[in-house]
């Protein structure tokens, strides 16, 4: 049987001599493999342009490479799960920054100034009982 025309073919990538790092943001977890290459970025087997539709997500994803002035020197393979697209981009940026430090430790001060190596610990606050939301109470009636 031939592959159905609706399903894209699975891309096989050779990342044997690559650096591995994980990034996290909100409930998203990104596993990053980074190697010297030509600037290809794959997210869950798709090109990042196909995976992320919004322009600000694409710009945010390329930010670590623009900061170190080497946007096309690395290939990235990423498996990301959990959360929404914004959280996934944040997790990927965190992971890419950590993987770049494995290639060159001198980049640490540059990436740290831009706060890319720091885990953003903000997440959704839980809903409390007796409240409508995490902090919003029910409407108060005096009488």
Show the residue positions of the predicted features:
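Intrinsically disordered, compositionally biased charged tails
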Residues: 1-17
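Structured, basic alpha/beta domains of bacterial-type, RNA-associated proteins
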Residues: 12-24, 30-72, 77-81, 86, ...
């Amino acid at each position: 049987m031939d592959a159905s025309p609706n399903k894209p073919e699975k891309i096989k990538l050779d990342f044997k001599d690559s650096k591995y790092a994980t990034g996290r943001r909100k409930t998203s977890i990104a596993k990053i493999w980074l190697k010297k290459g030509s600037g290809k970025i794959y997210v869950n087997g798709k090109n990042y342009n196909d995976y992320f539709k919004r322009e600000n997500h694409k710009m945010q994803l390329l930010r670590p490479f623009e900061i170190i002035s080497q946007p096309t020197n690395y290939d990235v393979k990423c498996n990301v799960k959990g959360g929404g697209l914004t959280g996934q981009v944040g997790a990927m940026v965190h992971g890419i920054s950590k993987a770049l430090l494995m290639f060159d430790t001198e980049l640490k001060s540059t990436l740290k100034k831009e706060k890319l190596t720091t885990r953003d610990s903000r997440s959704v606050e839980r809903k409390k009982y007796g409240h409508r939301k995490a902090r919003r109470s029910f409407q108060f009636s005096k009488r």
